[in-house]
Amino acid sequence: MSRWKVVILCLLSFMFEIGHASFQCNPKTYDGAFLNIVCVCNATFCDEIEPIGEIAEGKAIVYRSSLDGDRLKRMSMKMKEKLRKNESVNVTITIDASERFQNIFGFGGAFTDSAGDQFVSLSETLQNYIVDSYFGKNGLEYNIGRVPIASCDFSTHEYSYDDVHDDFELKHFALPDEDLKLKIPFIKKAIEKTEGNIQLFASPWSAPGWMKVTGRMRGGGAMRNDKRVYQAYADYFFKFFEAYSSHAITFWGLTIQNEPSTGADMAWRWQTMNYTAETMRDFLKKYLGPKLKENKLTETLKVMVLDDGRGLLPGWADTIFNDPEATKYADGVAVHWYGNLYSPAVLLDITQRHHPTKFIFGTEACAGYFGHHGPIMGDWFRAESYADDIITDLNHHVTGWTDWNLCLDETGGPNWAYNVVDSPIIVNRTAQEFYKQPMFYALGHFSKFLPRGSTRVFTKIEGNLAVSATSVVIEGGRRATVILSKASNSLLTRIVDSSTGFSIVLNLPPRSIHTVIWKKRK
């Protein structure tokens, strides 16, 4: 380990010892190109996020995370009208709260089988630490949760809720142990921690194999062209919501199919099913939509179409929303982050212009799915990638952002198809501890400070292309701006709220994320 890494680690450890102990990261370093730091949670300690508290007139609260080891570090700063003599800013960020856009739904992650498997492997104390870290008032305050309908790649095997061939009446429908022992206990703890303030949405990876032309959930292929199959699959959705309701779990929404474009690949390595925009439209308007609307339990569910990369927009949305029958049953578009490097964000703007009454919502993202598969412990670049994508999405009308697995093991699994990836929390069940990756703190800069119901406002950046930002107004007069700097040098930055006259100057250290919160002047 290089000398400067040792020095920084010693400083971090010293800060941990003398600071507000419950709020400080318990650091562990890994070898890497830079300082790779995770925060360790064990039976005796898990870090928390210091509350915002009261915001005095003329002051701002700033939270910082950085390559050098800050993890949502709280600071209080005074408003600054003038610079010192010979002082000039590198970047100016201007917020105009009079120009408003979409409301924020929220942020969260997925209750996969794999996440549940890791969760239940830990002691009750550590389980509570994970729930507190994600859903608690001193944690990220997640308010969104995704639940796979039956199995996906982050399961230990293929299964559906009814694998009895041609059981069109679904007499054999039943929740297996994966739901009863892995997903549901985790979800119920999150519901309790949030006092019910969590919106769950469900997504299937495939219909039961016997409903597909291939006879198997794994690999591509569409549903059998049989009205009995279409109706049985619509009934299958309802039975899922009914079964979870019997465990006191209700849902806010659903997507019709996870990544339907992958279903065109007959050799796809895990569960999927093919739809085109046209076949999704027809299944929705003829079968699924009517089934959901005719039942009180499901009549208000938010139905999202696509659930795939934004490169399929706006065409996919146009096909479904321009149909006068299908559009009655569809509320929004679900998008994944995969392929965003090759699909411009302006596609989101076009979709919003075409369909201003429908929302756009981010339903899946993860690091480690290409290049280096699986976790890279303490990797800051992946935290930057998360922050960069969330800022871009929010600035292009997306209403929220859902991470993939809430936690995984040290290999990035378990995953029956060996499609291992990274996660904000990595579990070491042998040592009975878990590690918060930099991605965890990057997510917190948004989920904790951009609450449900806040509204995105106009943000302009001048001075450096390595800086990006997004801003919201919050009920009660607060404003918040999240700033990502990917610059390798420090940048003196002024934030100006043109509607209130508020101005603050802060230094952005190299490779850092900041959330700045202030109050509207009376």
From Swiss-Prot:
Residues at the catalytic site: E259, E364
Example of a GO cellular component annotation carried by this entry: membrane
E.C. designation(s): 3.2.1.45
BP-aspect Gene Ontology terms: glucosylceramide catabolic process
Pfam families linked: Glyco_hydro_30, Glyco_hydro_30C
This protein's record includes keyword Signal: yes
Alphabetical keyword list: Hydrolase, Lipid metabolism, Signal, Sphingolipid metabolism
Gene3D superfamilies assigned to the protein according to its UniProt record, in alphabetical order: Glycosidases
InterPro entries: GH30_C, Glyco_hydro_30, Glyco_hydro_30_TIM-barrel, Glycoside_hydrolase_SF
Signal peptide: 1-21
Function according to Swiss-Prot or TrEMBL: Glucosylceramidase that catalyzes the hydrolysis of glucosylceramides into free ceramides and glucose. C.elegans contain specific sphingoid bases, which are unique or different in structure compared to the sphingoid bases found in other animals. Two examples of these distinctive compounds are: 15-methylhexadecasphinganine and 15-methylhexadecasphing-4-enine.
Family affiliation: Belongs to the glycosyl hydrolase 30 family.
Protein name: Putative glucosylceramidase 3
Lineage: Eukaryota, Metazoa, Ecdysozoa, Nematoda, Chromadorea
Gene: gba-3
